[in-house]
């Protein structure tokens, strides 16, 4: 959140035109739109409450939410995706608006933690749609996560006797 606040201040003072910052904002907006099935999502930093404001349209109504007031599962998913986008943007600034197409591998342990049933069934699709050139390696105990992927993308590890 500190990074988001600093970058917002730089933008307001016209001391920066950080393309990494813009990529992270767009990624959060896209993620929130997919998660909540809403449109016209805009994210901004609110200095009064030191939180992100998320404005969106739902059933033709304009809604303003703060990140701290949304479902914990959504918060976790948005945080995870924003973190990946931030790291991609910081490591590959030369890619500018194409940074989400950075190839790589991301390892996530126990991806189902903090996610409700719907998110467990959709998190891998959201990740692969958002970052199409990333290979995600995840561990899970959730049958919902396992059931959400094609069998050719699944490796089951079993403990062997004596090991």
Locate each region found by the language model.
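Switch/communication elements of ASCE P-loop NTPase nucleotide-binding domains
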Residues: 51-163
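Coupling/switch segment of ABC-type P-loop NTPase heads
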Residues: 1-35
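Intrinsically disordered, low-complexity segments enriched in polar/charged residues with Gly/Pro
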Residues: 29-31, 40-41, 114, 141-143
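Hydrophobic, Leu/Ile/Phe/Ala-enriched alpha-helical segments that form helix-helix packing faces
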Residues: 24-39, 84, 88, 127, ...
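Long, charged, glycine-rich C-terminal linkers/tails
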Residues: 38-55
């Amino acid at each position: 959140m500190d990074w988001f606040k600093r970058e917002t201040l730089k933008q307001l003072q016209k001391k920066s035109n950080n393309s990494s910052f813009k990529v992270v904002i767009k990624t959060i907006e896209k993620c929130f739109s997919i998660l909540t099935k809403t449109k016209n999502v805009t994210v901004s930093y609110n200095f009064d409450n030191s939180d992100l404001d998320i404005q969106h349209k739902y059933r033709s109504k304009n809604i303003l939410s703060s990140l701290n007031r949304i479902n914990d599962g959504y918060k976790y998913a948005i945080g995870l995706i924003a973190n990946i986008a931030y790291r991609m943007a910081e490591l590959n600034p030369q890619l500018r608006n194409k940074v989400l197409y950075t190839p790589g591998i991301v390892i996530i342990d126990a991806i189902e933690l903090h996610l409700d049933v719907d998110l467990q069934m959709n998190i891998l699709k959201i990740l692969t749609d958002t970052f199409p050139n990333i290979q995600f390696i995840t561990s899970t105990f959730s049958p919902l996560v396992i059931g959400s992927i094609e069998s050719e993308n699944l490796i089951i590890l079993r403990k062997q006797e004596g090991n």
